[in-house]
């Protein structure tokens, strides 16, 4: 018989830097999970992606065990890293803060494709380009 699923917890944690402090501790603690066990396993799985924010979906079972799935970093984080900026524009229509080439956008789209709800690479590229434009980044 399959384990009974109690909850799904979605968090965004810096790769290789999960620790029991908020937001990880309280989110897992209220479901009675082993916080340090999760932190060690997450850090081991994401140590090669240091410096990135990694979304994780933790599935909690009735016997207080858990499994988790790591996803690709958010598109906005990948775009900011490619454009070498700290944050997007407060007024994206007026103030442009950086620029990306179509090759860079395509590379980000290929990386994000497994997690995107896109029909194919073309639509994924359009989605990433739209995200970049909404952050005040020119796509050339």
Curated annotation (Swiss-Prot):
The gene coding this protein: rplK
GO biological process, one term: translation
SMART domains the record matches: RL11
GO CC annotation terms, alphabetical: cytosolic large ribosomal subunit
Protein name as annotated: Large ribosomal subunit protein uL11
Alphabetically ordered keywords of this record: Methylation, Ribonucleoprotein, Ribosomal protein, RNA-binding, rRNA-binding
Coiled-coil region: none
Subunit structure: Part of the ribosomal stalk of the 50S ribosomal subunit. Interacts with L10 and the large rRNA to form the base of the stalk. L10 forms an elongated spine to which L12 dimers bind in a sequential fashion forming a multimeric L10(L12)X complex.
Statement: the UniProt record of this protein carries the keyword Transcription regulation: no
UniProt cross-references to CDD domains, sorted A to Z: Ribosomal_L11
Physiological role: Forms part of the ribosomal stalk which helps the ribosome interact with GTP-bound translation factors.
Disulfide bonds: none
Record keyword ATP-binding present: no
Record PTM text: One or more lysine residues are methylated.
Family, per entry: Belongs to the universal ribosomal protein uL11 family.
Gene Ontology molecular function: any one: large ribosomal subunit rRNA binding
């Amino acid at each position: 018989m399959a384990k009974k699923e109690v909850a799904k917890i979605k968090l965004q944690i810096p790769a290789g830097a999960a620790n029991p402090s908020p937001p990880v501790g309280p989110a897992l603690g209220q479901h009675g999970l082993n916080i340090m066990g999760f932190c060690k396993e997450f850090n081991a799985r994401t140590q090669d992606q240091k410096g990135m924010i990694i979304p994780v979906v933790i599935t909690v079972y009735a016997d207080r065990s858990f499994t988790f799935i790591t996803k690709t970093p958010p598109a906005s984080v990948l775009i900011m890293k490619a454009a070498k900026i700290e944050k997007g524009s407060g007024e994206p229509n007026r103030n442009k803060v950086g620029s990306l080439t179509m090759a860079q956008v395509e590379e980000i789209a290929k990386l994000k494709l497994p997690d995107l709800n896109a029909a194919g690479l073309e639509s994924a590229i359009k989605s990433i380009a739209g995200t970049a434009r909404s952050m005040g980044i020119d796509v050339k």
